[in-house]
């Protein structure tokens, strides 16, 4: 099989780089590159600078594992939140969606993925050890009394919720799952705030 050579020119490398974005194929990447160079070179420069800064400065919160420029994110640093409640989500985008409902006042843990053996995603790849440590030895010193499983209602999300629930069951911690107001196969990122708020309130 012939080896595919990397683009040698700057335009080709830009098009290839844009293809790392989800849902962006060769033609979409080409349209983006042409648009930026033809219509908005200043915007392209700002985009390049902002992306470089984010890659250099954005890491993960030491407590909840979400994206953060500081060791502990603003949510985990907020003393008004209830440290005895912990909501587990798959991605930072899911955390943002839960926050927008204004119906959850506890803390979070972001898995940065979900169990999917076919994709090589096991417990180690979703920071499961860090999650257990967060639950067993909370940074706040306040024991966690309830864990809310807010993974997506996909087959992988359900498997992840089931796995976490089974591991936590012997520890005597209340484990709840958000209600099924969210369609089967649905992802939190695309659910409206009202539906998600009801799913949180009706958790069981």
From Swiss-Prot:
Pfam families the record matches: RecR_C (PF21175), RecR_HhH (PF21176), Toprim_4 (PF13662)
Keywords attached to this entry: DNA damage, DNA recombination, DNA repair, Metal-binding, Zinc, Zinc-finger
InterPro entries from the UniProt entry: DNA_Rcmb_RecR (IPR000093), Rcmb_RecR (IPR023627), TOPRIM_dom (IPR006171), TOPRIM_RecR (IPR034137)
Domain Toprim: 84-183
Zinc fingers typed C4-type, residue spans: 61-76
Any one Gene Ontology BP term: DNA repair
Cited Gene3D superfamilies: 3.40.1360.10, 6.10.250.240, RecR Domain 1
SMART domains (UniProt xref): TOPRIM
Disulphides: none
CDD domains referenced in this protein's UniProt entry, alphabetically: TOPRIM_recR (cd01025)
GO MF annotation terms: DNA binding; zinc ion binding
General function of this protein: May play a role in DNA repair. It seems to be involved in an RecBC-independent recombinational process of DNA repair. It may act with RecF and RecO.
Family: Belongs to the RecR family.
PANTHER family: RECOMBINATION PROTEIN RECR
Protein name: Recombination protein RecR
Lineage, opening ranks: Bacteria, Pseudomonadati, Pseudomonadota, Betaproteobacteria, Burkholderiales
